[in-house]
Amino acid sequence: MHAPSQIRLTFNQDHPEPHEHEDEGAGLAVQESKPVLQPPPLYKVVLFNDDYTPMDFVVEVLEVFFNMDREKATKIMLTVHTQGKAVCGLFTRDVAETKAMQVNQYARESQHPLLCEIEKDS
């Protein structure tokens, strides 16, 4: 086994003379700037209409995967039905991709052609 070696830490106050790599402007206060954080971009999760998926199934999807109550889910389903598509929510990219994948997988398992995709929010 090796014997522990002794380490001596020195601080600037221990050596008042400036080191050769230090600036001559000793005593200047420098304020560190905080990084500017940007919120992550948001993505729309969009449901598209088709001629085969039952309306009740679309309402169920909205309730289960987007935590909507029956009234809101019905309104979104009617928008999908009458306008061809509707936004189900805004999420970060990872969450939006996961929700779209879950909806598409559930629709396929239930043998419905319901399509869910994501679009970048403008």
Swiss-Prot record:
NCBIfam families the UniProt entry points to: PRK00033.1-2, PRK00033.1-3, PRK00033.1-5
Subunit structure, as described in the record: Binds to the N-terminal domain of the chaperone ClpA.
Upper classification of the organism: Bacteria, Pseudomonadati, Pseudomonadota, Gammaproteobacteria, Pseudomonadales
Function per UniProt: Involved in the modulation of the specificity of the ClpAP-mediated ATP-dependent protein degradation.
Organism: Pseudomonas aeruginosa (strain ATCC 15692 / DSM 22644 / CIP 104116 / JCM 14847 / LMG 12228 / 1C / PRS 101 / PAO1)
Cited InterPro entries: ClpS, ClpS_core, Ribosomal_bL12_C/ClpS-like
Entry's family note: Belongs to the ClpS family.
Region: Disordered, residue numbers: 1-33
Protein name: ATP-dependent Clp protease adapter protein ClpS
Name of encoding gene: clpS
Family matches, as HAMAP family: ClpS (MF_00302)
GO biological process: protein catabolic process; proteolysis
Chain intervals with Basic and acidic residues compositional bias: 14-24
SUPFAM superfamilies named among the record's database cross-references: ClpS-like (SSF54736)
